[in-house]
């Protein structure tokens, strides 16, 4: 029998080992599949089964027709979990409706060389595979050796992409076994380069593509993937603000894919029950628009009413097609990210990772740093260099946390200082700042005579406890800026967070050198230790998987600010 079992292990979040594993010894619980709905009448019926742990579902006992994750209609009988189950998954078996090339081309079911001889006979695979049967461990050894032959991170990213679209069990098992090495390959910082080169390195489509020129097709396109109980988690992006590298058009689907890979690795959501969605509304990236190989719409980004109507239809379609799914907004531009979150967060369980996820993980790091140095959050002054979605999310999360600890909101906002390309945000900038930025604007009179465009001068006057960088301005935290901060702060807390790595405001080695190893540093991408000091990583992958998992398990109807703070 075909025995490909996917199970979820729960382990310490700090080690990122909630991940997909494989086993071939699970007891079977069958989900019969009606073959006639999948193939013509001359397709032979198989009694062999595929076993796997399936993500937690409501306890359905009735028979119903749904679409499978491979896009075909099938009749399933769902078995209820144990009465007091709090686990994400339910063990069981399903009959596999696929055979031959169709089975080998389904990444959710394909086992490659691990199909047993019995399975090869039952599923018409004998002529399609070499005779030797491999274990998963042998497949892992072969795959890792192939990976090690590759010299560049981007080449390794290509290899992992190819593996993901062939065999998801092997893909997740390989990452789990080499997680410290491979997360930077499948996620930041390497994924940014893969996104930028998407149309040139394209191999096989993944996810759902929604075209703003065909808004009436949204519901039909979403329904291509499955039915109302087939999807737990959706990541959607319009690709305007990708990972610090800006507008990447159709390539933004890759950020949704990589986020969902982490949802499986760290949150335990089944890879067949997640959905990456790309909203193609055009691109303002002139390089992409001139590229004859670019695969998306080449017209300029559509904004205004047409854009809003398109988003409205998308939200309504999600609520109708996948009513229980959590919606994760990812890498929208600064003009749209916050307003879309505020508009739709109470219509369906949704959150914006750039705003709320970033804020949560930075808040956690700040709390840890203050605790380490015996300082109080109420006395903390934070200077955020970069006032986009991430910077504002960090500011809001710090303020919310202060408020929950008894600080007046107005007083809390006075302790947050924002800088953008014009310098420190002042009240006179109201016409050129967003409402979310303006609540942190400082009085022009208080800053009269000070060069508010100079980071050094602002640091000299603010005397920040914590300096946060999300500006994508490489090298912005210069030696004189850091030394000025260190004059007033014996243990400066410095978070250069911009991604990819080449856009970091400073590298940890310099920060430690300029502060005589006194700085408390956390970065947005992984860095090696400095003089024996381990560099912490302020990455969203430490926040959104747990938040998403909690929302899926609880069937939350709204993701509140208190839930973000708890995360």
List each model region and its residues.
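Short acidic, glycine/serine/threonine-rich loops at helix termini
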Residues: 221-223, 244-255, 286-293, 337-343, ...
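Rossmann-like adenosine-cofactor binding region
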Residues: 442-532
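N-terminal chloroplast transit peptides
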Residues: 1-27
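N-terminal ligand-binding/catalytic initiation module
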Residues: 8-13, 31, 42-44, 49-350
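Short acidic (Asp/Glu) and glycine-rich catalytic loops that position anionic groups and cofactors
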Residues: 95, 241-243, 463-465, 542-550
């Amino acid at each position: 029998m075909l025995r490909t079992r996917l199970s979820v292990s729960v382990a310490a979040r700090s080690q990122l080992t909630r991940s997909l594993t494989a086993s071939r010894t699970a007891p079977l619980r069958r989900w019969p599949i009606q073959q006639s709905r999948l193939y013509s009448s001359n397709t032979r019926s198989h009694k062999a089964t595929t076993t796997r742990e399936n993500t937690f579902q409501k306890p359905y006992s009735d028979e119903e027709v749904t679409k499978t994750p491979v896009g075909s209609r099938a009749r399933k009988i769902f078995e209820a979990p144990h009465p007091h189950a709090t686990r994400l998954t339910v063990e069981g078996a399903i009959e596999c409706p696929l055979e031959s090339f169709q089975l080998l081309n389904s990444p959710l079911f394909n086992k490659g060389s691990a199909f047993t001889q019995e399975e090869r006979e039952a599923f018409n695979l004998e002529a399609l595979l070499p005779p030797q049967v491999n274990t998963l461990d042998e497949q892992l050894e072969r795959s890792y050796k192939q990976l090690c032959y590759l010299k560049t991170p981007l080449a390794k990213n290509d290899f992992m992409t190819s593996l993901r679209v062939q065999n998801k069990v092997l893909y997740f098992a390989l990452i789990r076994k080499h997680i410290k090495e491979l997360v930077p390959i499948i996620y930041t910082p390497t994924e940014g380069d893969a996104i930028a080169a998407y149309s040139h390195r394209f191999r096989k489509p993944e996810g759902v593509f929604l075209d703003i020129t065909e808004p009436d097709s949204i519901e039909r396109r979403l329904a291509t993937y499955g039915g109302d109980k087939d999807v737990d988690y959706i990541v959607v992006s319009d690709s305007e603000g990708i990972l610090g590298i800006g507008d990447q058009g159709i390539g933004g689907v890759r950020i949704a894919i990589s986020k969902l890979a982490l949802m499986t690795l760290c949150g335990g959501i089944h890879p067949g029950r997640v959905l990456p969605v790309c909203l193609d509304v055009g691109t303002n990236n002139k390089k992409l628009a001139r590229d004859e190989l670019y695969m998306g719409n080449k017209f300029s980004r559509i904004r205004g009413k047409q854009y809003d109507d398109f988003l409205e239809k998308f939200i309504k379609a999600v609520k109708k097609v996948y009513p229980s799914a959590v919606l994760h907004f990812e890498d929208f531009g600064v003009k749209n990210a916050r307003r879309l979150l505020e508009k739709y967060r109470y219509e369906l369980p949704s959150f914006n990772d750039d705003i709320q996820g970033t804020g949560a993980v930075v808040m956690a790091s700040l709390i840890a740093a203050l605790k380490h140095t015996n300082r109080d959050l109420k006395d903390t002054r934070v200077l955020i260099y970069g006032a986009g979605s991430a910077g504002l999310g960090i500011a809001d999360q710090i303020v919310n946390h202060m408020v929950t600890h008894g600080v007046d909101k107005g007083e809390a906002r006075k302790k947050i200082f924002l800088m953008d390309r014009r310098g420190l945000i002042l009240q006179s900038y109201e016409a050129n700042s967003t409402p979310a930025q303006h609540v942190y604007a400082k009085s022009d009179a208080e800053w009269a005579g000070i060069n508010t465009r100079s980071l050094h001068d602002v640091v000299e006057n603010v005397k920040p406890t914590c300096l946060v960088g999300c500006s994508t301005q490489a090298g912005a935290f210069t030696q004189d800026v850091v030394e000025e901060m260190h004059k007033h702060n014996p243990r400066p807390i410095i978070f250069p967070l911009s991604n990819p790595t080449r856009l970091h405001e400073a590298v940890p080695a310099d920060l430690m050198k300029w502060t005589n190893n006194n700085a408390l540093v956390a970065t947005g991408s992984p860095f090696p230790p400095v003089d024996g000091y381990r560099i912490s990583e302020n990455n969203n992958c430490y926040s959104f998987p747990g938040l998403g998992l909690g929302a899926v398990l609880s069937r939350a109807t709204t993701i509140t600010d208190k839930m973000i703070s708890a995360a």
